[in-house]
Amino acid sequence: ETGRIHHGGNFQAMAVTNAMEKTRLALHHIGKIIFAQSTELINPATNRGLPPSLAASDPSLNYHVKGVDIATAAYAAELGYLASPVSTHIQSAEMHNQAVNSMALVSARATINSIDVLSMLVATYLYNLCQALDLRALQAEF
């Protein structure tokens, strides 16, 4: 109505940066839960009668999902690394003409990486679940 435009100059896009950081942290927590469940599934002390490492044959010779467990641990650790904030790494640019710069794109790219890692973690967990289900079916008595 007044003919004036008020612009806050929000080129830093901290709202987007922070939203992506919180999203990555949530993905990390989901990954930690899946890792814990996967660990309990392959551990004979917590899996209610399934063989160690979900081995279908002799558990002392067959370490079926040991490698998968190592991968899930690596994925969970990587999710923790990726959950770190990027907003603390803002640098001055243009000979200090731009004192603060947007980290929104960097944060979004890190979130995409987190989604990829979480997808691999979920895939390994689903593999373990399928193996456990097959072993339970072999144990079933009718």
From Swiss-Prot:
Catalyzes the non-oxidative deamination of L-phenylalanine to form trans-cinnamic acid and a free ammonium ion. Facilitates the commitment step in phenylpropanoid pathways that produce secondary metabolites such as lignins, coumarins and flavonoids. InterPro entries: Aromatic_Lyase (IPR001106), L-Aspartase-like (IPR008948). GO terms for cellular component: cytoplasm. Contains an active site 4-methylidene-imidazol-5-one (MIO), which is formed autocatalytically by cyclization and dehydration of residues Ala-Ser-Gly. It comes from Agaricus bisporus (White button mushroom). It is an enzyme of class 4 (lyase). This is Phenylalanine ammonia-lyase. The keyword Amino-acid biosynthesis does not apply. One of its GO terms (molecular function) is phenylalanine ammonia-lyase activity. Pathway: Phenylpropanoid metabolism; trans-cinnamate biosynthesis; trans-cinnamate from L-phenylalanine: step 1/1. It holds the Pfam family Lyase_aromatic. Keywords: Cytoplasm, Lyase, Phenylalanine catabolism, Phenylpropanoid metabolism. SUPFAM superfamilies: L-aspartase-like. The lineage of its organism: Eukaryota, Fungi, Dikarya, Basidiomycota, Agaricomycotina. It catalyses: L-phenylalanine = (E)-cinnamate + NH4(+). It is found in: Cytoplasm. (E)-cinnamate binds at residues 66, 94, 97. The gene is palA.
